[in-house]
UniProtKB/Swiss-Prot annotation:
Family matches, as InterPro entries: HD, HD_metazoa, Homeobox_CS, Homeobox_NK-like, Homeodomain-like_sf
Family: Belongs to the NK-2 homeobox family.
Protein name in UniProt: Homeobox protein Nkx-2.6
Matching Pfam families: Homeodomain
Involvement in disorder: Conotruncal heart malformations: A group of congenital heart defects involving the outflow tracts. Examples include truncus arteriosus communis, double-outlet right ventricle and transposition of great arteries. Truncus arteriosus communis is characterized by a single outflow tract instead of a separate aorta and pulmonary artery. In transposition of the great arteries, the aorta arises from the right ventricle and the pulmonary artery from the left ventricle. In double outlet of the right ventricle, both the pulmonary artery and aorta arise from the right ventricle.
Top-level lineage group: Eukaryota
GO molecular function: DNA-binding transcription activator activity, RNA polymerase II-specific; DNA-binding transcription factor activity; DNA-binding transcription factor activity, RNA polymerase II-specific; RNA polymerase II cis-regulatory region sequence-specific DNA binding
Organism: Homo sapiens
Amino acid sequence: MLLSPVTSTPFSVKDILRLERERSCPAASPHPRVRKSPENFQYLRMDAEPRGSEVHNAGGGGGDRKLDGSEPPGGPCEAVLEMDAERMGEPQPGLNAASPLGGGTRVPERGVGNSGDSVRGGRSEQPKARQRRKPRVLFSQAQVLALERRFKQQRYLSAPEREHLASALQLTSTQVKIWFQNRRYKCKRQRQDKSLELAGHPLTPRRVAVPVLVRDGKPCLGPGPGAPAFPSPYSAAVSPYSCYGGYSGAPYGAGYGTCYAGAPSGPAPHTPLASAGFGHGGQNATPQGHLAATLQGVRAW
């Protein structure tokens, strides 16, 4: 007597194989659990009802079911899951019908994004078109000369002076104001550049001629035996001493005659200054004594 497929035993081969299939089916085909569209649920119900009716109709004759072999050995539930998994690989009309809904929700989003980008691009282009640079004001040569002349006289103008100058030159007050600002900035830049040039190229030191008075520990004398080798500025220092030769009077001769030992002494004439005790000295010896003292002082110096 054969057992019907409805009854199960825990030690039969079919039950062991069915347990393995139940473990492998949820892991291998998770798609039936993920899909939750109403078309899919309707398809599962329609697919499961004939299977159930066939199972109940074939429940009386178990031997005929075995010989037929149309029923898979896993049971009705597994057959429904396997058929559902096979149908997943094929394109289904239910999914195609549902896909436009999802696509419809995405397409408007892209359209909105594109339109937003286009709007932003239009807004960003509008300020660029509005920011047009004003044309440059060209001054005539007469206006530039008049402005330069006034700038040399006065670098800063008050509002009334600016208005008066602008009306005289047929310009606006703003144009005159901007011209003076640019001119002041130009002068400042020129001063800075000039200072940098002077700092980069310092002035050469001046050379001053210095006369050589002593060389190798000896005074530098001229070719003459007694004439000192001084340049023209220093020759004036000797000339005052030579003028003492003209003073041959008794008062001066008497006072300076005894100061030098090398001067010859003679009888001094009887003068009031000599009797007063100013010393003895000859009239002719005084100029020679002065010249000798002058030469000795210059040589020692």
